């Protein structure tokens, strides 16, 4: 009896201890992305303690041009900065003016971050490259749940900064700079035209720490190269105002009659367009009819907006205002406008297939003719997300032109000046005779890596909104004037009617995010080798009904994937035009990504998020190496971009 009770007691005790152990291992619902261990250092160790003689100052912070901050407009959109006050060296460093204030005992500058879907406290801090910390963001926003970050959420940020101490430093500005892995005190002194002693003194007699901010002392205000001063004298301003007033009066009198006449003609034309459009929409499906609620004619602004859910945003003083955030909608063009833009759809403006080049109001466009069935199957619902309009890596749909039921309609896309990726890696530009003869049309290794990164970012965006592209290939990757990649055919996955076998549907038949990933792996192979997979395998395009060819393809494909996993044999498939001007380690990592993406089992392939992170690390490594080269030949903050458009016209939809 006693033995039985003892066994029951021991069994219960073991169960209780096991429960407690498992409970301690399980994650809590209040977990955050911040890691306190990584940010345990005090701000004072980096020289940010307030000085009693200076409570605030105007200074600057620096960001490197990388996602999500590519340009001036990115900073203005994400951080709410005034575009006219930003100093942006294209492709190099972004210089941000800030007001540094003493908050308690520590200097900091306040900014507001406009969140997007997928943001976390950690991702925001990482995007700012050490100017703030994950824990600081969480402390400054105690009432905002990290799990609910998304569009229209405003985060308050405390940017690290400092003011020069009178009598101690001769510097007029202490610029906050994110230290890179390859930065050193000596290299920073050369880049910013200062001394090593001044940098060490400004940072509490210590050196610089990679991936942490450092203070760079400058004795003058950084200025944009070639900038023009905008400080005319009072006399000049008065004269300018008088000239404007006189010109306005004359223009008003002379244009009154003209305005009345053309106003009537324009109203009549607009009425005809809207009547024709509504007639077309009334015969379509409910989703297309819903789009009519967002349609504006060309007499309106390029971007119109609709209200958000909360109906409030922060104004310039960071207070809640009544202005309603809005979403971009499509523009509707009259058929006569497209005729004029394309010179009556002349052969000289024909790009390929049903796509024409057009120029309207000084803007280059790609205009695609589509039949009624294609227009009906176009996924207009994707365009309701404002992130589509601001996405740098997707060819944007700008507008439409609806015609009669029995006539073809048109989709209007942004125009990519430098053709498709296929044109470049297959060296077809010479055949098209659309390149500048003095230029050698060739993609360098670093440019190829950046294009792979751009496509990965586009896939990450599309899969985040649960959209499967279904037609990812080098012919549908286009290059803008800066040779950055943009994915075409967005919204047309239901319009694809290709009957020929492709590499991915020889292995699997259903469309899914994994099939897009497979297609991405094929593009990476083309970038590496300068050849199509068919050329690498020694095969030709065949009909999908050929079972023997399918078995041969799968066998040869497995052999090619094994080749990508061998660093020595990889040289055999590298594009010969690259010569030795590429990193073997970088090429092997890209080949590994291609190999992982084309795994036979869909569940074994990485996600678009994983791919973007892996390629991003390669881009960062290349940029760090390039920074070292820039230091040797430049001593200023700002340099001009050397990229030039090489192609006159390019297709948007293949």
Curated annotation (Swiss-Prot):
GO cellular component annotations of the record: plasma membrane
Compositionally biased region (Basic residues): 227-238
Annotated membrane topology: Single-pass membrane protein
Transmembrane segments: 242-262
Keywords in alphabetical order: ATP-binding, Cell membrane, Disulfide bond, Glycoprotein, Membrane, Nucleotide-binding, Repeat, Signal, Transferase, Transmembrane, Transmembrane helix
Keyword Ligase on entry: no
Glycosites: 103, 170, 193, 204
Protein name as catalogued: Protein LYK2
């Amino acid at each position: 009896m006693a033995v039985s009770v003892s066994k029951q007691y021991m069994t219960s005790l073991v169960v209780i201890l096991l429960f407690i152990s498992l409970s301690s291992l399980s994650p809590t619902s209040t977990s955050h992305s911040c890691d306190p261990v990584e940010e345990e250092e005090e701000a004072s160790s980096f020289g940010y303690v307030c000085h009693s003689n200076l409570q605030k100052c105007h200074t600057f912070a620096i960001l490197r041009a990388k996602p999500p901050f590519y340009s001036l407009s990115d900073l203005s959109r994400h951080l709410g900065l005034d575009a006219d006050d930003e100093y942006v060296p294209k492709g190099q460093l972004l210089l941000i003016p800030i007001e540094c204030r003493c908050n308690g005992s520590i200097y900091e500058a306040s900014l507001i971050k406009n969140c997007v879907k997928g943001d976390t406290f950690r991702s925001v801090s990482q995007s700012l490259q050490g100017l703030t910390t994950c824990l600081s963001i969480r402390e400054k926003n105690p009432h905002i749940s990290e799990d609910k970050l998304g569009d229209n959420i405003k985060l308050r940020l405390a940017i690290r900064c400092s003011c020069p101490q009178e009598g101690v430093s001769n510097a007029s500005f202490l610029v906050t700079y994110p230290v890179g892995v390859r930065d050193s005190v000596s290299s920073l002194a050369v880049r910013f035209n200062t001394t090593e002693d001044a940098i060490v003194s400004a940072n509490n007699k210590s050196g610089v720490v990679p991936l942490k901010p450092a203070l760079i002392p400058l004795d003058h205000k950084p200025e944009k190269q070639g900038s023009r001063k905008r400080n005319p004298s009072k006399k000049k301003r008065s004269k300018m105002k008088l000239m404007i007033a006189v010109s306005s009066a004359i223009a008003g009198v002379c244009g009154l009659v003209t305005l009345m006449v053309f106003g009537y003609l324009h109203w009549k034309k607009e009425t005809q367009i809207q009547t024709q459009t509504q007639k077309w929409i009334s015969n379509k499906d409910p989703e297309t009819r819903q789009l009519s609620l967002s349609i504006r004619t060309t007499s309106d602004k390029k971007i119109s907006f609709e209200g958000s859910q909360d109906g409030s945003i922060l104004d310039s003083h960071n207070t809640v205002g009544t202005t309603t955030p809005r979403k971009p909608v499509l523009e509707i063009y009259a058929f006569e406008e497209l005729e004029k833009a394309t010179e009556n759809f002349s052969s000289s403006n024909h790009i390929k297939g049903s796509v024409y080049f057009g120029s309207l109001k000084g803007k280059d466009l790609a205009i695609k003719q589509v039949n009624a069935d294609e227009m009906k199957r176009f996924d207009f619902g994707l365009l309701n997300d404002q992130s589509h309009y601001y996405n740098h890596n997707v060819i944007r749909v700008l507008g439409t032109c609806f015609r009669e039921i029995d006539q073809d309609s048109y989709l209007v896309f942004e125009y990519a000046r430098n053709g498709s990726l296929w044109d470049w890696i297959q060296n077809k530009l010479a055949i098209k005779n659309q390149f500048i003869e003095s230029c050698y049309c060739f993609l360098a290794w670093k440019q190829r890596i950046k294009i792979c990164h751009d496509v990965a970012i586009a896939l990450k965006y599309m899969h985040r909104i649960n959209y499967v592209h279904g037609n990812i290939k080098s012919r549908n990757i286009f290059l803008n004037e800066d040779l950055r990649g943009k994915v075409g055919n967005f919204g047309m996955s239901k319009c694809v009617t290709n009957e020929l076998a492709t590499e991915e549907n020889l292995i699997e038949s259903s469309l899914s995010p994994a099939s897009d990933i497979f297609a991405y792996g094929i593009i990476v192979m083309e970038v590496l080798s300068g050849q199509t997979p068919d050329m690498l395998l020694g095969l030709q395009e065949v009909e999908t009904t050929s079972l023997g060819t399918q078995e041969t393809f799968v066998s040869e494909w497995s052999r090619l994937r094994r080749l990508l996993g061998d660093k020595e044999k990889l040289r055999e498939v590298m594009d010969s035009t690259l010569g030795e001007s590429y990193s073997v380690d970088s090429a092997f990592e890209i080949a590994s990504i291609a190999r992982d993406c084309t795994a036979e089992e869909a569940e074994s392939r990485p996600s678009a998020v994983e791919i973007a992170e892996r390629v991003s690390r390669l881009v960062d490594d290349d940029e760090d190496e390039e920074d070292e080269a820039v230091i040797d030949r430049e001593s200023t903050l700002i340099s001009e971009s050397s990229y030039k458009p090489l192609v006159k016209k390019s297709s948007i939809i293949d």
